[in-house]
UniProtKB/Swiss-Prot annotation:
The protein's name in its UniProt record: Heptahelical transmembrane protein 2
Organism (species): Arabidopsis thaliana (Mouse-ear cress)
Cytoplasmic compartment residues: 1-70, 183-198, 246-256, 305-326
UniProt superkingdom: Eukaryota
Gene: HHP2
Compartment(s) of residence: Membrane
Keywords attached to this entry: Membrane, Stress response, Transmembrane, Transmembrane helix
Signals that turn on the gene: By abscisic acid (ABA) and the cytokinin benzyladenine (BA).
Function: May play a role in abiotic stress response.
Family the UniProt entry places it in: Belongs to the ADIPOR family.
PANTHER family linked to this entry: ADIPOR/PROGESTIN RECEPTOR-RELATED, HEPTAHELICAL TRANSMEMBRANE PROTEIN 2
Cystine pairings recorded for this chain: none
Keyword Transmembrane helix: yes
GO cellular component terms attached to this protein's record: membrane
Amino acid sequence: MQKRRTVKESTKIRNGKGMDSGEKKRSEKRLMKFEELPRYLKDNEFIHNHYRCEWSIKETFLSAFSWHNETLNIWTHLCGFAIFTWMMVVSSMETTELGLAGFVSLLSGATIRWPWPSMAMSKDVYFSSDQTLHHDLNVTHTRSLLNSQGDVNYEAIPKWPWLVFLTGAMGCLICSSMSHLFACHSRRFNLFFWRLDYAGISLMIVCSFFAPIYYAFSCHTYWRLFYLSSISILGLLAIFTLLSPSLSAPRFRSFRAALFLTMGFSGVIPATHVLYLHKDHPNVLIALVYELAMAVLYATGAAFYVTRIPERWKPGAFDIAGHSHQIFHVFVVLGALAHSVASLLIMDFRRASPSCAF
């Protein structure tokens, strides 16, 4: 009996179907310790337990609904993806008034109609909300403003730059969630998904520039083209750089963070230019404050990502919840939301001055 079993196992090995360690781990479907992991799954030595290792695709997918050290990494960005998906759906509706007040009205139940023609259907002027929006508009002043500007070209305030940003944010967040979910399946999946994750981050950074630059520089075609082309080229270079398998290694964590921050902070140049051009417009000034908040949020998240605080201070204590990557994810979502507010404010500004009559 023992001899027959040995012959059977030998046949499986010759056919390439041996019971290697990976197959045993997949069949066991248990959470492992850091020291038990294959080298390609060893990323953070301060997280000691609750690792998934080479589970089947089905089991890996279903693990999104169980507790392990990647659960909150998956769901923090999956929830962010849901938020931006909702924003995309709302923005794609023909009757939606894009702009900050338009989104506030959707959340508060208020009805908002703007004092100028826009992408939405409304042309009357009133704010109606007894609960959250107490803001009176002077109808006479509004009509005189419209008369002084003449007919407004609806094409001057397109939706597509805003939708580009939402697409980039959604792409980044879903790629991140899928990477944290499936990267443990195999070495091949690990390499593919982490490279996809880094490409998604680069995509969101590039797409984030489109709405504010397009609307802020709508009357300055050369500068608009220059800034959008520059950040797009920089983003493509970053993506091609990060596609290198060696740069996906844990030891290049600081390099990746520095590259992403460099891309993000390159926005200081167009932001300064916008401030110079539109310093007398309150919406622009407030938008720049939100952009500053975005930069602080992203930089803070990157600091947690690189330093591995707080798990560095107490290894093993933050395996399930509270470790640095989860905190980093929260700051990324908050930073993207801050940028959303800034972009909507710039859109409000552009809609108020559609004819470039500054």
